[in-house]
C-alpha cells in the first residue's frame, strides 16, 4: 500500500493581466480546456475538476498551450520564448523537445491539421514569429512582414495551407506555404489586432482588435468579405477592445469576448449579433479570452473566473471561482464539509469539499494579502491581512456574510492568527503587538521583538508567539492580558507554531528546517530528542492531526512531510513535490488520514495519508 495518494485537486485559475488577451487551448475531443498560470500548464475537464492535469516542467512563466489535432502532443510557450513539446498520453508528460523560438514572450501557438508543423508568435528582438517542424525544430518558413509584436496566429485547417497572424501594427498578415512565406497584409483595424481564427473548414477567417471591430475574410487569399456590426453601436461589434474570438464547431457562428464586459454570439451568414451576454459591471468582469469546443463555450474574466456560456439561451450557466495568486491560508468548517482559502490579493473562496464547487466571498473582506484565516464552531470567519485589520465575518446563508464583517484596526501589521474553536478569543501576532480580540473588544499588548506566527491552546490557557528573534515566546492568557512564562530558543527565525488539539504538545518550526515538538506539561521541554530536519528548505507551516498523533508540515522545498509522535525515530512520510515548483504555504487536516495543502502555485490538493 502506498504511503500517500492525491485524492483531489482544486486547480488554479488562469493568470490574467488587465488589457491582455488570454489564449485558451483545448483537446481534440473538446472535453478539456488548457490555460496557464505561473510556470504550469493546466488541462482541465469542462465537466468537472477531478481529472485536471498539471504540467510543471517550464522554468519560466508560461503564456500559452495548445494540443495537437492528433491529441498526442502539446506545445506550450513561456515568457523567454521557449516552446516545449511534450507527450499528453502519459501522466509523466515526457518532453519531446524544446525549441527556443525567439527572445521574448510567446503569445500564441498553432498546430497544422496534420500535427506536423507549429507556428508560434510573440514579442522577440529579432523576429516576432516562427514556423517549424514539431519533431526536429527545423524551420518551415519565415513569418515576417509585420512591424511590431504578433499577438495571434492560426493555421488554415485544410489545404492549401495558410498561416494568418495579427499584430500590434494594426494589421492582419497571411502567409503561403509550406515552406511559408509572406503574401500580404490587411489594414482593416485601426488599433492592435488581438485575435485571428480560421473557421473549421478553412473557408473563412476572422480578426478582432482594440478598435472593437470583427472583420471576416476569405480563407485562401484574405479578401475582406464582411464586418460584424451591432446595430445598437456605431459601426463596431463591441464598445471596447475585443480580446478574443472563437468559431462554433459547425462554423455558422462566432463568439467574441470584449473589454465592454460582454460576450456576443454572431451569425456568420448575416454578420449580425444573435445574443449579447453581459457578464457584470466591474472592471474585473472584462472578458479577456474565449474558446468554443465541441462540448462547451468558455470565457475568461479579467479576475480569472472561468465562465461556461450557454449560446442558445444567451446566459452563463456556471462560473468556476478560485485563485490565480498565491494561496496564503486555509481553514475548514467545523463539520468538515466546507474549505475556506485566502490569497495574496485579499480574496477568500469557499469550497464544497465533496464536489469542488467554489464561491468567491463577496464583497472582498480585504484588499491586500491575507495572512491568517480561521473558522469557528459557530460558522464565523476570522481574518487578518496586511491592510492592518482583524475582521470577523459572521455566518450567513449557506456560508458567511462579508457585507456584515466587523473590522478592527490593528496598530501594526499582522503576521499570524489563532482563534479558539468557539470564537470567544482571537489572537493576532502583529509586527510590534499581540492583539487579543474577545467578545467584541480588541486589546493590544506591545512586544519588544518582531513576531512571525501565533498559536492558541484549545483550553485558552496558553498563547505561543513565534518571533523573528529566533525564539518562541509562551504566554499565560488571562482574559485580555498575557504574561510570559517561557522563552524557547531556536537556531533560526520561527516560521510556524501549533498546539495539539488536546493541549499536550506545542510544535515550532523555523527557517533552519527544524520541526521541534515540546511537552506542555513538562514546562515546554523537548517532547523527544530526535532530529526532525528532513525538509531541505525553510518550513513554512504546520498542523496537527485531530487525534494528536501526527503532524504535517509544508515547506519552501515544495514538499509536505507527515511526522508521527508515537514513532519519532521512524522515517516520516514525505510527499515530495507536493506542489511542484512552488512553496507550500498552508496545510490543515480534515480528518485523521486526510491533509489539505495549498501553495504559491494557487492550487489546493487533498492527500490521503494512511497510518
Swiss-Prot record:
One of its GO terms (cellular component) is sarcoplasm. InterPro entries: G-protein_beta_WD-40_rep (IPR020472), WD40/YVTN_repeat-like_dom_sf (IPR015943), WD40_repeat_CS (IPR019775), WD40_repeat_dom_sf (IPR036322), WD40_rpt (IPR001680). Keywords: Actin-binding, Cytoplasm, Cytoskeleton, Repeat, WD repeat. The keyword Repeat applies. GO terms for molecular function: actin binding; actin filament binding. One of its GO terms (biological process) is locomotion. Pfam families: WD40. Induces disassembly of actin filaments in conjunction with ADF/cofilin family proteins. Regulator of actin organization in myofibrils. Belongs to the WD repeat AIP1 family. This is Actin-interacting protein 1. It comes from Caenorhabditis elegans.
